[in-house]
Amino acid sequence: PGGRPKYHAKKYKHQTDLLENDDIDAVIIATPDHWHSKIVVDAVKAGKHVYCEKGLTRTFQEALDIHDAVKETGMILQLGHQNRQVEANDKAKEIIDQGLLGPVNLVELTTNRNSQWGAWVWNIHKDANSKTIDWETFQEPSPNKIPFGSEALKRYFRWRCWYDYGTGLSGDLFSHDYDQLNQIMEMGIPKYASASGGIYFYKDGRDVPDVWHVTLEYPDRDMTVLYSATLSSNNSRGNRIMGHDATMILGGQSNAGGVGGFSVE
């Protein structure tokens, strides 16, 4: 953290101090999701270009705030979907653009994980306490505040399990697979969307689902996109683009095994 010692990288406790440094041209934001909007807006207004990890924001209003700030300042914003650099996605796009699959009417995207790590149940550091964690700053942008204590420690280290700080399966994992599809097929925004799910395995106080199912309808493309996820099974299913003449099976972006290639059947 803070860079290799020999380069004497300066450390900052708060982002406002860092943004006041005129020697900094761009920033990388890899905080929990609930801080993204404020830091992005502050950064572009301070004249810094921004690379921000997904999910970009927790709420639609936060996304609008970022849009307006970036447009107003003219700074560059890049969203951190790092799998855009996967060569297999470019090859898959070439195959589809050549029409080798024929008309595509159904796409299935999936996430399967089956470990505490994959379900964001991460260890609470033995030295974590009110002196080593600035809890009030951490929870500052969250809609619901709680006092520091055992519950706060759990939320600090496992923040992805609560919508106060993260975006759950939607922004954390589905966003990878949808971005992969968008890169390959340029889907854009669906006309209709519905989702359902629940907390069926990890009864640990979280409020984000551990099972989730999404249907996206693209009537102008004659296509339905399905996404299903579970955090209690490691049956890796991959992602399927099903055409009239052939089906393309892609390695899932957000499964525990990492990014794979693809096959055409």
Language-model segments: residues:
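N-terminal glycine-/serine-/threonine-rich beta1-alpha1-beta2 phosphate-ribose binding loop
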Residues: 1-52, 61-76
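N-terminal Rossmann-like dinucleotide-binding module
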Residues: 1-6, 83-86, 96, 181
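Short loop/turn motifs at secondary-structure junctions
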Residues: 6-8, 23, 100-103, 189
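Alpha-helical packing segments of well-folded alpha/beta enzyme cores
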Residues: 39, 62-63, 88, 177-180
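The substrate-binding groove and active-site-proximal loops of carbohydrate-active enzymes
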Residues: 49, 80, 167-170
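Short strand-turn motif at the edge of the Rossmann-like AdoMet-binding core
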Residues: 54-56, 80-83, 111
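Rossmann-fold dehydrogenase core element
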Residues: 64-82, 92, 100-107
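Contiguous beta-strand/loop segments that form the cofactor/metal-binding neighborhood of enzyme cores
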Residues: 90-91, 103, 108-112, 117-265
